[in-house]
């Protein structure tokens, strides 16, 4: 069975983005993201793809979901739906969903794992991670709170579905 992991950095109010960008810069979170996703297929929506500074993400199979039938994501595969994107991952051990908000919302009922960077900020934004229903998710691992090189407090948390 395919392990489906959602990976995200979330503010205290579950904000994940503002104006198609992350509202903070935590180099340690980027390093964790890279280390966790290398060698795995990563699935993202079109807006997330377009916001990436480097496309495709190297060392990973990039799959972009777009309802635009003729959408071209150079260096990536495209899929018309989350289900089609997951079907492209047949044979892989794990698929990592990396956003954005709409894709997280669709994927949450299918996810087996959550890899959340809890950012100790409450920010205004226009993209939010879905609420984590504690009746379905248990905390499997949590790092101590750390302070990033940019001065932002954060923790890495791994949730497993009950």
Curated annotation (Swiss-Prot):
Gene Ontology annotations for the cellular component aspect, listed alphabetically: cytosol
Keywords, in A-Z order: NADP, One-carbon metabolism, Oxidoreductase
GO-annotated molecular function: dihydrofolate reductase activity; NADP binding
Binding-site list for NADP(+): 8-9, 16-21, 45-48, 65-68, 98-103
Enzyme Commission no: 1.5.1.3
Catalysed reaction, written as an equation: (6S)-5,6,7,8-tetrahydrofolate + NADP(+) = 7,8-dihydrofolate + NADPH + H(+)
Binding residue positions for substrate: 7-9, 29, 60, 117
CDD domains per the UniProt record, alphabetical: DHFR
Occurrences of domain DHFR (ranges): 3-161
Biological process per Gene Ontology, one example term: dihydrofolate metabolic process
Pfam families: DHFR_1
NADP as UniProt keyword: yes
Pathway annotation: Cofactor biosynthesis; tetrahydrofolate biosynthesis; 5,6,7,8-tetrahydrofolate from 7,8-dihydrofolate: step 1/1
Source superkingdom: Bacteria
Family, similarity comment: Belongs to the dihydrofolate reductase family.
Function summary: Key enzyme in folate metabolism. Catalyzes an essential reaction for de novo glycine and purine synthesis, and for DNA precursor synthesis.
Protein name: Dihydrofolate reductase
Native organism: Neisseria meningitidis serogroup B (strain ATCC BAA-335 / MC58)
Taxonomic lineage: Bacteria, Pseudomonadati, Pseudomonadota, Betaproteobacteria, Neisseriales
